A protein has these predicted regions:
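C-terminal beta-strand-loop-alpha-helix "lid" module of Rossmann-like NAD(P)-dependent dehydrogenases
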Residues: 1-286
Length: 286
């Protein structure tokens, strides 16, 4: 059985750990609030430009535009957004599980140290690695978007996918992999077919013409999609870290309480034993 001194030392150590995790929880909570606001505020613009692409797609020959044209090959480029630091619960491990299910010839662009280390360790082809700043802006996304578009237009890859953690709420973040290029996939084609009548009934005017507008909008669309993904990845990271640190603090506090009860029980038992020894000795002396 552990001695009183050992238990007391453990209580102190665990209490100090709880203080550290609580401080990290508060820091993560402050960052989480800002990141969540940025991710939420970016969604309306992302939806608007997405709707614009859909509207134009109903007025043009989709196969004539390289960023819309579909390919039957299996060469893929995956843009993988992870975190630079750990202590974010199961966030990165969920991403790694999604990644392991990928098949075919795959290249990777990574943003986040955890992801780049995993790719290198797995022996996969790493095309480029980018830092993911604490407060990302759209400038961070430009080189990522450029490489993705260039690789696709040069036909070095047949599809471009993004793997990231989609932000839903503080308690829910989901590892998601979805197609970025070509922009029109099978699912969107079905949706466009059902929306065609609505678009025809609602006349749209594109100046100077739909093709010219599309040429200008498509690169901006890719850039904004990547930027929105970065914002959601950051919101997910800070949310997961805040929850993980909160759980760690609560677990440490519970363990410290249990050890305190054990400490008090052993101490009380020792005191009772001493009293009994003194009483026994006193009776023996009478």
């Amino acid at each position: 059985m552990a001695t009183l001194r050992e238990i007391k030392r453990r209580i102190k150590s665990i209490s100090n750990t709880a203080k550290i995790t609580h401080a990290m929880e508060l820091v993560a909570a402050a960052k989480m609030k800002r990141a969540q606001e940025s991710a939420t505020n970016g969604k309306p613009y992302s939806k608007l430009i997405n709707d614009t692409i859909r509207s134009i797609a109903n007025h043009i020959d989709q196969a004539a535009h390289p960023l819309l044209a579909r390919s039957q090959g299996d060469k893929s480029l995956v843009i993988f957004f992870s975190t630079d630091r750990g202590l974010a619960g199961s966030l990165n491990s969920n991403l790694f599980r999604e990644l392991e299910e990928l098949v075919g010839k795959t290249k990777f662009i990574t943003a986040g140290k955890k992801g780049s280390r995993f790719i290198v360790k797995s022996g996969k082809e790493l095309l480029a690695d980018f830092p993911l700043p604490e407060k990302p802006d759209i400038a961070v996304c430009r080189p990522i978007a450029k490489i993705a578009i260039d690789e696709f237009l040069k036909k070095n890859v047949d599809q471009v996918h993004v793997l990231y953690t989609e932000f839903t709420s503080t308690l829910k973040q989901t590892a998601v992999i979805r197609q970025l290029l070509p922009i029109i996939d099978e699912e969107i084609l079905k949706e466009l077919a059902t929306e065609a009548e609505e678009f025809q009934a609602r006349e749209s005017l594109f100046e100077p013409n739909p093709d010219t507008v599309l040429e200008a909008v498509l690169p901006q669309y890719i850039l904004m999609e990547i930027y929105q993904i970065v914002l959601e990845a950051k919101a997910s990271e800070h949310s997961a870290r805040m929850v993980a640190m909160k759980n760690a603090t609560e677990n440490a506090s519970d363990l410290a309480e249990d050890l305190t009860l054990t400490y008090n029980g052993i101490r009380q038992e020792a005191i009772t034993k001493e009293i009994l020894d003194i009483s026994t000795a006193a009776i023996a002396l009478e």
